[in-house]
Amino acid sequence: GLFDAIGNLLGGLGL
């Protein structure tokens, strides 16, 4: 989902 993608991006940024 949308939030899943956001979480994935945040995880990639190290946040």
Swiss-Prot record:
The keyword Secreted applies. Coiled coil: none annotated. The keyword GTP-binding does not apply. One of its GO terms (cellular component) is extracellular region. Expressed by the skin parotoid and/or rostral glands. Keywords: Amidation, Amphibian defense peptide, Secreted. Caeridins show neither neuropeptide activity nor antibiotic activity. One of its GO terms (biological process) is defense response. The modification Leucine amide is found at residue 15. This is Caeridin-3.
